[in-house]
Structures are given as C-alpha cells and as structure tokens.
C-alpha cells in the first residue's frame, strides 16, 4: 500500500498571489531538485534550511523562475521522507512552469491527500489526526479551528488508545485464564470484573458521545433557515448577521425568490445561513418554485429563525408557519419593534410554547446581541469551551463510537445472562476493533484510500 516513489504537487491555492509552493516528497526529492536548481548544492546544505536560487529548464537551459527552496530531510518531516518545497512567484504561469519541469524529471504527480497519507502510513500521525488536517483547512470559526488543532495534536487519539488498552488487557486476561487454567498466579477474570471494566469504558464512550453533537456543529456548522412571511425582515436579518448586503431588501413583498446561502460566525458557532423565499400561497410560478424549495430547506435545517412583524397582527400564514416548525428547533424573532405595535406578544408566546422569543429592530441594529446569545444557548450552555474538552466532531468517528459503546452493552447483557466468558469477550473485542478504526489501527485499505481521496491536491 505504501508507495516509495517521489511525488509532487502544487500546495497553494489556485490563482494569483505573492507566493506559490511546489512540494516534493520521497527519496529522490532533494536529488531531483538539485538537478534543476542553480545556487548552492542542495545535497550538501543542512536540513531545515531555505536556499535562494533559480530553476533552470533542462530543455532550453534557460532560467525558468527565481525561487527560494526549503530542504527538509527525513525522518524529521511531515511525511518522514525527504521533503522539498519550491517557493516561486504566485500566479498560474509561474507555478505551473516549475511543476512541469519537476514532472519532466520523472517525479509523479501526487494524488489528493497523498502527502498526508504518507505521514499516516509512516506512523507520523494516526487516521484521526490525518482527518483533523482537513478539518483545520475547512474550519470556519476559531472554535472549529481549536477543535481541529487539538485533534491533530492527538488529544482524541490518546484517549482512544487508553480505552483500547484497557479492553486489550481485559481480553488478554480472559484468554490467559482459558488457555492456561493451571496458572494459579493469574487471577481469574470473573463476570463481575468483566462487567465492571466494560462499564468503565462504556461510560467514557458515553461522555464523548454526549458532546459529539456540539463537536459536529463546530466542524460542519448549523444548517440554519430564515423563514417568515414576505417583508417581515428576513433579508435584513441575513444582512445584519453577514454584515454585508447579500440579498436585495425592498418594500415589495416576495422580492427574495430563491435560496440565498451564507456562512456566518455567531459566537464561535458556524451557521450556514439560508434566506428562503417567503412561504405563502402564490399564483406567481417563479415565486412558487422558491416557496417549494423553502419548505424542503425547512425540513433539512438544524435551526430555524422564524421572523415575525411587530407592526402587524399575527396572520393565518404566521399560524401555518408555527404548525410547520412544530417539533423542530427554532427561535422566534419579532422584528421592527421600532414601529407601532400591532402584534399580540402573549399570543406569539402561546404559539411558540417553550421556544426562545427575541425582539429586534434590525435596521436600527437593536436586539442583535440577544439574538446571537439565543442561537448559541440553543446548542451550547454558556460560552463554548474548547480548552479542556475532547470533542468528537467527525461523523465517521461518532458512528464508530456508537458501535463500540453498543458492543460493550452487548457484552454486559451477555454477562447478565450468564454467558461463558469466551463468548462475552467477542463483544469486548468488537468494541476494541471499532475504536481501532477511528485511529486507523484496524481500518481497511479501501477505507483509508477513500478517506484520503477527499483531501485537496498537494496536502
């Protein structure tokens, strides 16, 4: 599974910029770069240094680019191989020219995520740490970045390894009892001891799963729909949160005829904000399409921001919207409180039941702090603490933790039924294997290939 050839790729985003980087990794990385580099002898310079020089096109013997070359010798590198990073001028022409010259020397173009995959296969990081690399790149808030950094640092890995070790010692103890019953110096593993150990690990997994939803929110963001009758201030709400005009705000009801999306950071919680067309019955075919799409978005949302107009009584359409969001997670926003009151607030609270109700005058920027607090408090109690918490944010990890927990509960049930110890240990071993998939110890080659294929090229 481990390729040993030298690979290369552009490691910086496509487009114009001050600097672009062509990365190489493999046993021939330094040798090949030295063949196209005019400057100091790269094979003799100290590791982890950067050298100024020029890239020479072997085909024309002309200067192709002025560069700074970083030399890093394995195993003290990300991939644990020799690594070279050619820093050239930004822009597609310059960086592609350097890449073409490197490829012409026989270096293979890297597959997506192959540098990180090599780091994993060489034991530099485990699978959960490798996945955290991509989470870090995709992080949309400081809190999400903090969670990814801690996972990259091995916080989750160390906990999983500790729990797996406890299960492994338990299984090994049982096997010694079964295979070598004559060993009097080895205490027999009783059903009570096995149940106690299984419960201890199960409880630790349960703690992780209890805050897993919060971790998933920090990683992926909340799909948040803004709903309400036309002209109640939905676009004004989005504009206030995004702090730039993404939707046209007019006095004509029904202006927003399509789905408008934007990511926003609300007190560390990433929201994928969706401004829907006003949900109402309409004869306008174009608007009706937008309304149908809005209803679908509603069903798929994690959170709904339901906007009402302080300047108008509660309408039949408003009441239908309350019916539509019944059983869903939503916050009621009473907007336009700077105008004359026509809305019965007691009636609104009766329809909202125990859901949060926030008053705003968005065009006057009033009530925004209270709204942001209500959003954060809906999913997090108080300030979001990423310092001492071990968050599980990856859906794959969450599913495996659930399976590991269930396997231990199966073992505990077997003990209650008086099943033989060698049968009970099968479920304990299953739990150990499920946790091993998180860090890659028991993951299949096909799973590993599939995970790394989701990475960006050059990472």
From Swiss-Prot:
Q: What family is this?
A: Belongs to the TRAFAC class TrmE-Era-EngA-EngB-Septin-like GTPase superfamily. TrmE GTPase family.
Q: What is its EC number?
A: 3.6.-.-
Residues binding (6S)-5-formyl-5,6,7,8-tetrahydrofolate: 23, 85, 124, 459
Task: Quote the CDD domains the UniProt record gives.
Answer: trmE, TrmE_N
Name of the protein this chain belongs to: tRNA modification GTPase MnmE
Q: What class of enzyme is it?
A: hydrolase
Q: Which GO terms describe its cellular component?
A: cytosol
Q: Where does GTP bind?
A: 231-236, 250-256, 275-278
Q: Which NCBIfam families match?
A: mnmE_trmE_thdF (TIGR00450), PRK05291.1-3 (NF003661), small_GTP (TIGR00231)
Residues involved in Mg(2+) binding: 235, 256
Q: Explain how, and how many, cofactor molecules are bound.
A: Binds 1 potassium ion per subunit.
Q: Where is the TrmE-type G domain?
A: 221-380
Q: Where would you say this protein principally sits, based on its record?
A: cytoplasm
Q: How does it assemble?
A: Homodimer. Heterotetramer of two MnmE and two MnmG subunits.
Which species does the entry assign this protein to? Oceanobacillus iheyensis (strain DSM 14371 / CIP 107618 / JCM 11309 / KCTC 3954 / HTE831)
Q: What is the lineage of its organism?
A: Bacteria, Bacillati, Bacillota, Bacilli, Bacillales
Which superkingdom, per the lineage? Bacteria
**Per its record, what are the GO molecular function terms?**
GTP binding; GTPase activity; metal ion binding
Q: What does this protein do?
A: Exhibits a very high intrinsic GTPase hydrolysis rate. Involved in the addition of a carboxymethylaminomethyl (cmnm) group at the wobble position (U34) of certain tRNAs, forming tRNA-cmnm(5)s(2)U34.
Q: Which SUPFAM superfamilies would you find in this protein's record?
A: P-loop containing nucleoside triphosphate hydrolases, TrmE connector domain
Q: Which Gene3D superfamilies match?
A: P-loop containing nucleotide triphosphate hydrolases (3.40.50.300), Probable tRNA modification gtpase trme, domain 1 (3.30.1360.120), tRNA modification GTPase MnmE domain 2 (1.20.120.430)
Question: Where on this chain does K(+) bind?
Answer: 231, 250, 252, 255
> Which Pfam families does the record associate with it?
MMR_HSR1, MnmE_helical, TrmE_N
UniProt keyword annotations, A-Z: Cytoplasm, GTP-binding, Hydrolase, Magnesium, Metal-binding, Nucleotide-binding, Potassium, tRNA processing
């Amino acid at each position: 599974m481990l390729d040993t050839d030298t690979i290369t790729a552009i490691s910086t985003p496509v487009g114009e910029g001050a600097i672009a980087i062509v990365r190489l990794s493999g046993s021939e990385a330094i040798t090949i770069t030295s063949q196209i580099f005019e400057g100091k002898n790269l094979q003799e310079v100290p590791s982890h240094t950067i050298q100024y020089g020029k890239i020479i096109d072997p085909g024309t013997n002309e200067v192709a680019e002025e560069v700074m070359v970083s030399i890093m010798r394995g195993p003290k590198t990300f991939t644990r191989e020799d690594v070279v990073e050619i820093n050239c001028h930004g822009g597609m022409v310059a960086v592609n020219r350097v890449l073409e010259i490197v490829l012409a020397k026989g270096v293979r173009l890297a597959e997506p995520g192959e540098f990180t995959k090599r780091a994993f296969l060489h034991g530099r990081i485990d699978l959960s740490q490798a996945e955290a690399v991509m989470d870090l790149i995709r992080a949309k808030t400081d809190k999400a970045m903090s969670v990814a950094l801690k996972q990259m640092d091995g916080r989750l890995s160390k906990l999983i390894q500790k729990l797996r070790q406890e299960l492994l010692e338990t299984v090994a103890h049982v096997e010694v009892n079964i295979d070598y019953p004559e060993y009097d110096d080895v205490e027999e593993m009783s059903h009570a001891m096995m149940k106690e150990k299984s419960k201890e690990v199960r409880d630790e997994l349960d703690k992780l799963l209890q805050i897993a939803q919060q971790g998933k929110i920090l990683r992926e963001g909340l799909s948040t729909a803004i709903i309400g009758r036309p002209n109640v201030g939905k676009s004004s709400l989005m504009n206030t949160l995004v702090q730039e005009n993404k939707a046209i705000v007019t006095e004509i009801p029904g202006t927003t005829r399509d789905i408008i999306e934007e990511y926003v950071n609300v007190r560390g919680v990433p929201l994928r904000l969706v401004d829907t067309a006003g949900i109402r019955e309409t004869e306008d075919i174009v608007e009706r399409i937008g309304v149908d799409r809005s209803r679908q978005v509603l069903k798929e949302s994690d959170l709904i921001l339901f906007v009402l107009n302080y300047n108008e009584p509660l309408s039949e359409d408003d009441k239908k919207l309350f019916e539509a969001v019944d059983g869903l997670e939503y916050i009621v926003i009473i907007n336009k409180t700077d105008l004359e009151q026509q809305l019965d607030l007691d009636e609104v609270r009766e329809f909202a039941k125990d859901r949060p109700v926030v008053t705003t005058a968005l065009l006057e920027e009033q009530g925004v702090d209270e709204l942001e607090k209500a959003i954060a408090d809906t999913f997090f109690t108080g300030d979001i603490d990423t310092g001492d918490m071990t968050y599980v944010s990856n859906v794959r990890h969450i599913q495996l933790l659930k399976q590991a927990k269930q396997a231990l509960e199966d073992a505990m049930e077997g003990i209650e039924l008086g099943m033989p110890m060698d049968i009970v240990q099968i479920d304990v071993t299953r739990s150990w294997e499920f946790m091993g998939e998180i860090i890659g110890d028991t993951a299949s080659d096909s799973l590993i290939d599939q995970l790394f294929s989701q990475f960006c090229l050059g990472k």
